[in-house]
Amino acid sequence: MIEWSKLIKGTLIKRYKRFKADVKLSNGHIVTAHCPNTGSMKSCSDPQRTVYLSKHNRPDRKLKYTWELIEMPTSLVGVNTGIPNKLVKKSIENRLIKELSDFEKIRSEVKYGENSRIDILLENKNVKTFIEVKNCTLLEKGICYFPDAVTSRGLKHLQELQREVHQGNRAVMFYLIQRMDATRFEPASHIDPVYSEELKKAYENGVEILAYDVNIDTKRIAINRSIPFKL
């Protein structure tokens, strides 16, 4: 579980230049917040929606606010892509993810592959488990999709995970759904067909797929349950 610092409520005016969002606070002031998400944010960036910001007082920060959550009709949605790695690691450490509970050592951001870093590496006497974590927010008719934009980086990760399996290690693609209203996970073949086909290939070659959603409110976010997937 990760607890938010006190969040500030506002109304989204617009997201622009990918990393910025203008928000009208409840006191009427308009602020520019950092948007910690490089994706298209389809289905979770509608203007006039209620959003929640964290505030940071570090003197070196140009933007004092960070956009954390948005209220959509059927769920709060977490937009901060820095959250999934932290939440998944904490959940693994607390043995909350049964598929990833057999380990003696856990590390983050370990170099591997071709100039890459694996999000989480689990180790025991018998095997290394390489875990790549992806943030998922795109929802259409109850199905959560990844990616929400073409991703060459994501494609590279799938290829590197397959190489780890070939070398005798375990590899896992972990899709964290930062919302509570998804019934299933699927690769977004209508957005990035190349990634979708590579995910199918990776699965056939032994890369495991896990999709979990969260419980989320304005005080905290916690891992919730395993969600079925369809390739």
Which residues fall in each region the model found?
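Conserved catalytic cores of phosphodiester-cleaving nucleases, focusing on short active-site segments
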Residues: 10, 118-148, 161
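Short, charged beta-turn/beta-strand-edge "cap" motif at the junction between a beta-strand
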Residues: 14, 55-60, 177
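Short aromatic-glycine-enriched beta-strand elements
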Residues: 17-22
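Short nucleic-acid-contacting surface segments enriched for D/E, G, S/T with interspersed K/R
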Residues: 39-52
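Acidic-basic catalytic patches of nuclease active cores, encompassing PD-(D/E)XK
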Residues: 42, 74-107
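OB-fold/S1-family single-stranded nucleic acid-binding modules
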Residues: 58-75
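Nucleic-acid nuclease catalytic cores
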Residues: 142-152, 162-191, 213
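Domain-level recognition of nuclease-like catalytic cores that cleave nucleotide substrates
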Residues: 178-231
